[in-house]
Design a protein with these regions (language model features):
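Beta1/beta-strand and adjacent pyrophosphate-binding region of the FAD-binding site
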Residues: 2-14, 32
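Core beta-strand elements of the Rossmann-like FAD/NAD(P) dinucleotide-binding domain
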Residues: 3-6, 191-201
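Active-site lid/adjacent beta-loop-alpha segment flanking the redox-cofactor pocket in flavoenzymes
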Residues: 235-327
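Central helical "cap/lid" subdomain
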Residues: 41, 195-241
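Dinucleotide-binding Rossmann-like beta1-alpha1 core, especially the glycine-rich loop
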Residues: 49-129, 250, 289-291
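Glycine-rich FAD pyrophosphate-binding loop
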Residues: 25-44
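C-terminal catalytic lobe of FAD-dependent flavoproteins
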Residues: 152, 291-382
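Flavin (FAD/FMN) cofactor-binding and adjacent substrate-gating region
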Residues: 70-73, 95-166, 171-172, 178-185
Length: 382
């Protein structure tokens, strides 16, 4: 059997794997990416794809701010002919309790200290700007007008296609079944058809599939999958509805550029599985919840429903770190907010793989924090 080689192997064709492949190919690195199905077939392509700078920790905010600097010109940069549907209609966090409102104020104060244009708004101010929203029970909101929406499928595909155009090898429908290591160093990967590829550096960025793959070389990751559901409606008149996140029951909704509405809700008790099955309980619950907030959508038909896996960690924050196996880098565990971090994730992984200093301090994302019981809690987690 002929062993093939590369400078860097990437396992996982979600947005982080694809963006890293793009960044490396742009730098002239010989990179090969393996994806078990099609690009974006896992969590990335099934994402609600809200873009936000509403976080409550400096580490996440620095990366989120970078993302929103990249997105406005990314379609032109990648130049694949696919529309990314980037819009900046804003992102709203809605408080129904004093304690929640106080935390939102703390988050906004931190954001504004980093020159992120977030604001607190009263119910009257919200009603004046978005008269179709029902304000019952709302005591205040946090809002950032620079935040918005992107198409998760075309974003991931565009990164992958641009990487291929620049010389990267992108192998879809080519599952990696195990990693290879020797004398404590990464050696490469083996695919389902028995093909062996060697490289001195491997990036494992396969969402919830990262945990079992890391175990093939003795690396224990704390990630686990959790199913989350979404639905999309038929299109209606476009009225630039922002992403609205209701912090009483976790429901959220937004209008997409084609006029459709996307609904989601974080229901408790969802199974820890990568299986993308549908939930009738979700369909009934989320429609009732969202229609209370935006009654104008009553009678609008649901076109389809789907689910996808979050890649959760115990503190619901990502892992971006070298593992105990020399040369094996992991970028996983984003716990539901990874799609929007595609630009920042690709940049820092490229910097690490090329021996450069990352543009942000990644200490809080280190793998050892779990064993050290020094968890990285984010107050603006959904």
């Amino acid at each position: 059997m002929t062993v093939k080689t590369a400078d860097v192997i990437i396992v996982g064709g979600g947005v982080h794997g694809a963006s890293t492949a793009y960044e490396l190919a742009k730098a002239g690195v010989k990179v090969v990416l393996f994806e078990k199905e099609y690009l974006g077939s896992g969590g990335s392509g099934r994402s609600a794809a809200g873009l936000r700078q509403h976080f409550g920790t400096e580490t996440n905010l620095h990366m989120a701010k970078y993302n929103l600097q990249v997105f406005p010109t990314l379609e032109e940069e990648l130049d694949t002919g696919m529309p990314l549907e980037f819009t900046q209609w804003g992102y709203m966090w809605v408080a129904y309790a004093d304690s929640v409102l106080a935390q939102l104020q703390k988050n906004v104060d931190l954001q504004r200290s980093l020159d992120i244009p977030s604001v607190m708004m009263t119910p009257d101010e919200v009603k004046a700007r978005w008269p179709y929203l029902c304000m019952d029970g709302i005591i205040g909101v946090a809002f950032c007008g620079d935040d918005g929406h992107i198409n998760p499928q075309t974003l991931t595909l565009s990164y992958g296609h641009a990487a291929r155009r620049l010389g990267a090898t992108v192998k879809t429908y080519c599952p990696v079944v195990k990693l290879l290591a020797e004398n404590g160093k990464i050696k490469g990967v083996v695919t389902e058809d028995g093909e062996e590829w060697h490289a001195p550096k491997v990036l494992l960025s396969a969402g919830p599939w990262s945990t079992p793959l890391a175990a093939t070389v003795g690396v224990e990751l704390p990630g686990y999958p959790e199913r989350h559901n979404l639905l999309i409606t038929e299109p209606v008149e476009v009225f630039d509805c922002p992403m609205v996140l209701c912090l009483d029951d976790g429901a959220y909704f937004k209008q997409c550029p084609n006029g459709t509405f996307m609904f989601g809700r974080d229901d408790p008790g969802e199974p820890h599985t990568t299986e993308c099955s549908n939930s009738a309980k979700f369909l009934e619950g989320v429609t009732k919840s969202v229609l209370k907030r935006i009654p104008a959508l009553s009678g609008v038909r649901v076109v389809r429903q789907w689910s996808g896996p979050y890649d959760n960690t115990p503190d619901h924050n990502a892992i971006i770190d070298w593992t105990p196996v020399e040369g094996l880098l992991v970028d996983c565990g984003w716990s539901g907010h990874g799609l929007q971090f595609g630009p920042a994730g690709g940049r820092v992984c490229k910097e690490l793989l090329m021996g450069e200093k990352p543009f942000v301090d990644l200490h809080r994302f280190r793998l050892s924090r779990f064993a050290e019981n020094d968890l990285f809690f984010e107050p603006a987690f959904i």
